[in-house]
Swiss-Prot record:
Gene3D superfamilies: D-Amino Acid Oxidase, subunit A, domain 2 (3.30.9.10), FAD/NAD(P)-binding domain (3.50.50.60), Vaccinia Virus protein VP39 (3.40.50.150). The keyword S-adenosyl-L-methionine applies. It catalyses: 5-aminomethyl-2-thiouridine(34) in tRNA + S-adenosyl-L-methionine = 5-methylaminomethyl-2-thiouridine(34) in tRNA + S-adenosyl-L-homocysteine + H(+). GO terms for biological process: methylation; tRNA wobble uridine modification. Signal peptide: none annotated. This is tRNA 5-methylaminomethyl-2-thiouridine biosynthesis bifunctional protein MnmC. Residues 1-245 are annotated as: tRNA (mnm(5)s(2)U34)-methyltransferase. One of its GO terms (molecular function) is tRNA (5-methylaminomethyl-2-thiouridylate)(34)-methyltransferase activity. It comes from Yersinia enterocolitica serotype O:8 / biotype 1B (strain NCTC 13174 / 8081). Residues 270-680 are annotated as: FAD-dependent cmnm(5)s(2)U34 oxidoreductase. The keyword Oxidoreductase applies. Its cofactor is FAD. Its EC number is 2.1.1.61, 1.5.-.-.
Length: 680
């Protein structure tokens, strides 16, 4: 999916104090009463708030064209909050709101517009606090303690709609067909939009729009909606509403199919790291029943147990799935970690910024490639040596790229706190449970443990065991590698304590953690090695990398490794550096079912859905980027298991599918060589 730069909205204000789009020459809402217009046209036009009480599911999905000032969303949120307060035991507990916006407003303009509606102030303030950077693609925002999911898709709706994942098909309960008037914004109002609305709507899904233009009515009818004209708001004579009478058949690539979990009331998670904890929380937020089994006596004893880890996006300037995923993952992670802190979840951290140095020609070439993209300066910006040094507090010796929203946090603290939070929310934990075997018996998964020697059974299982993922018979063919990494703990000095930012070079160095007066410097990279003993040569290599990359300044000589303080963990890595998240693919069945796949596609044969192990899911291959990727992959997995809309486009989701390496070869008619993952 191509992600062109996003231009923010340019506003003026008319005599009535209503914001006007300079791009479209049209007002954002009625001069008479924007709030009443929203309530009449979009909520009442779709049968809300009365439909809340009649909704048959626990989640109601809305979609909108033109987020604008967020007035429609804020009004709906207010009405839903009132409904929940009056009907706490109702079936409906969550809202999912999907909106497309080509020219997002800046926060200051949002704040100015929101002053018109003091009754929405508490909701508007929360929205502005989470307002995303102007980056193309989807920004998932969790509000109201997870009861409301807002997916803001920035970009041209006609470009975005064809690239949406099939998880949005037959999902939308109500469409708010907003945006500027057809005469002012003719490019939006076309058959691409109308057909996508029908494809995404559930049977019985509705729409409402302020316009009664004939070509809009005809386009929606042709797409499959039953359309009616009703009295318009205020001085407008007519508006349109409608309903989709029957489900529309939709198509997607069957080889990247993402099956949901048939039941979510008995889920076992195997693992004890950060992605296990975040997956548990994402499932619990959806009212799942979760039991976690961890081989260790405490959480965060593996790769998630480090004292400090850097958080920053992985950019490459290629606008490919890797960059799109990690840009989305980073911004989602920062929002989620900040929300956790606001909730009182404590973990050592500093949002101090991260500087990536151009320490040699190769790294300079990579950074120059990254900077060819017109990034918002709040995400990434080119900096000279002098600028980076002023920010870092020490001479950085090189120019480079600066990530102002990055920083460091303590993975061990965070994981432990998240596990405790999950238990408070109802998760059952069993530590000291060493899983040795998974067996499918009578429609259930049998979990066979060696320590203690007990068997458990669950309907659904999520494997989140890091580098141990390939140990099970169902996952042994996944192309994963174990990579040992030793992080050195360095006592601070008066000079080193001046470092105010994380420095990344051919390694990384963190600022001092005030809690222990140490820095972290790392990390070694030993593929295929799962031992975690201290090694003096790796300790020395961590120091030497810093000295090699910054040879012209003296302060790195202050790094003292003589006390041999370090921690070693084992990462789960993969060749393309992207996580694996989704249903566990059935290796043998995939090869048998997709033999001669190109010919079958060419001849138009029916292609069956990708074979997977039933009710068995996984999340892994986070490598050394788990702090960045774990929150989003946990959200992706939970959304898949519950059959909800995904926060990424089709191409990027396919690049995360655990079967992707096999499918790519099969689509080219090439053989898939059987291999067992590198464990030791």
């Amino acid at each position: 999916m191509s992600h062109p730069p996003i231009q923010t909205a340019t506003l003026s204000w008319n005599e009535q104090g209503t914001p006007v789009s300079e791009q479209f020459g049209d007002i954002y809402f009625s001069n008479e009463d924007g709030l009443e217009e929203t309530h009449y046209v979009f909520l009442k036009g779709n049968g809300f708030p009365e439909r809340f009480a009649l909704h048959p599911r626990d989640n109601c999905v809305f979609a909108e064209t033109g987020f604008g000032t967020g007035l429609n969303f804020l009004t709906l949120w207010r009405d839903f909050a009132q409904f929940r307060q009056l009907h706490p035991a109702a079936k409906l507990q969550r809202l999912h709101y999907i909106s497309f916006e080509k020219y997002p407003l800046q926060v200051a303009d949002l704040a100015a517009a929101h002053q018109r509606w003091p009754e929405l102030a508490c909701f508007a303030e929360q929205l502005r606090a989470q307002w995303p950077l102007p980056l193309a693609g989807c920004h998932r925002i969790l509000l109201a303690e997870g009861a409301i999911t807002l997916d803001l898709w920035f970009g041209d709706v006609n470009t975005l709609l064809p690239q949406l994942d099939s998880s949005l098909n037959n999902q939308v309960d109500a469409w708010f067909l907003d945006g500027f008037a057809p005469a002012k914004n003719p490019d939006m109002w076309n058959d691409v939009l109308f057909n996508a609305m029908a494809r995404m709507a559930r049977p019985g899904g509705t729409f409402a729009t302020f316009t009664a233009a004939g070509f809009v009515r005809r386009g929606l009818q042709q797409a499959g909606f039953d359309v009616a004209k009703i009295k318009g708001f205020g001085q407008k004579r007519e508006m349109l509403t409608g309903i989709l009478p029957q489900r529309l058949n939709t198509q997607s690539e069957p080889w990247y199919h993402r099956p949901l979990a048939t039941r979510c009331d008995d889920i076992a998670i195997i693992g004890g790291g950060i992605v296990s904890a975040l997956t548990a929380l994402a499932l619990l937020r959806r009212s799942a029943k979760v039991t976690l089994y961890c081989a260790d006596a405490l959480p965060a004893q593996g790769a998630s147990g480090n004292r400090q880890g850097a958080l920053y996006p992985l950019l490459n300037g290629k606008n490919d799935a890797l960059e799109i995923f990690f840009t989305s993952a980073f911004t989602f992670a920062r929002r989620q970690y900040s929300q956790l802190l606001e909730q009182g979840i404590r973990f050592d951290h500093q949002w101090c910024g991260v500087s990536q140095l151009a320490f040699d020609e190769k790294s300079r070439g990579k950074i120059n490639k990254m900077l060819q993209t017109d990034w918002p300066p709040q995400l990434a910006a080119a900096m000279s040596r002098e600028q980076l040094s002023a920010l870092a507090g020490l001479d950085c010796a090189h120019d480079g790229i600066h990530y102002p929203a990055g920083g460091w946090l303590c993975p061990s603290d965070l994981t432990t706190a998240l596990m405790a939070l999950a238990q408070q929310l109802g998760m059952t934990c069993h530590y000291g449970h060493e899983l040795c075997q998974l067996e499918r018996v009578d429609g259930l998964w049998q979990l066979i443990f060696t320590s203690p020697q007990v068997n458990r059974q669950h309907t659904t299982v999520v494997l989140a065991t890091g580098h141990r993922l390939p140990e099970w018979q169902q996952t042994q063919h996944l192309p994963l590698s174990a990579v040992r990494g030793q992080v050195s703990h360095i006592p601070t000095t008066p000079v080193l304590s001046q470092l105010r930012q994380v420095l990344c070079y051919d390694g990384y160095l963190t600022p001092v953690n005030p809690a222990n007066q140490h820095h972290c410097i790392g990390a070694s990279y030993q593929r295929g090695d799962v031992t975690t003993d201290f090694r003096a040569d790796e300790q020395q290599e961590n120091r030497d990398r810093l000295l090699r990359c910054l040879p012209d300044v003296s302060w790195p000589q202050q790094v003292d490794i003589s006390d041999n303080q370090a921690r070693c963990g084992v990462r789960c890595a993969i060749r393309d550096h992207l996580p694996m998240v989704g249903a566990v693919p059935d290796y043998s069945a995939t090869l048998a079912q997709y033999q001669d796949l190109p010919r079958k596609i060419q001849h138009g044969e029916d292609i069956p859905l990708a074979p997977v192990w039933p009710e068995l899911f996984m999340v892994g291959a986070l490598g050394s980027r788990g702090l960045c990727s774990a929150p989003l992959v946990a959200e992706i997995l939970a959304a898949q298991m519950f059959g909800e809309p995904q926060p990424l486009d089709t191409t990027t989701l396919a690049a995360l599918n655990p079967n992707r390496f096999w499918i790519r070869k099969l689509l080219k008619g090439r053989p898939v060589q059987q291999r067992v993952s590198v464990l030791s």
